[in-house]
């Protein structure tokens, strides 16, 4: 299950959260290696974006909670279809169910 997660952190001074931001990058590395995260990017100005590939919403919930422990934020979560699944869906009856 693919999910795009976009964080909007609390409006703290950037200098006050440098250590937490470094910890977040370290926290992401094993997730990338394991495949739970496919990609991650810093947002211009504030925040981050991550693409998670998880087996369940419970796993996603755990990851977002871990992320929140490092950097408290508001999270926008978008479920995604991979390109092959989207094209397969469109090929069936013109995309109708």
Model-assigned labels for residue ranges:
Residues 1-97:
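Conserved, structured core segments of small domains
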């Amino acid at each position: 299950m693919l999910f795009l997660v976009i964080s909007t952190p609390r409006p703290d001074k950037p200098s006050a959260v440098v250590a937490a931001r470094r910890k977040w990058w370290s926290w992401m590395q094993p997730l990338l290696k394991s495949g739970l995260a496919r990609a991650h990017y810093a947002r211009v100005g504030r925040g981050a974006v991550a693409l998670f590939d998880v087996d369940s919403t419970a796993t996603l919930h755990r990851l977002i909670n871990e992320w929140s422990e490092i950097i408290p934020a508001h999270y926008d979560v978008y479920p995604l279809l991979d390109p092959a699944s989207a094209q397969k869906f469109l090929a069936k009856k013109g995309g109708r169910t």
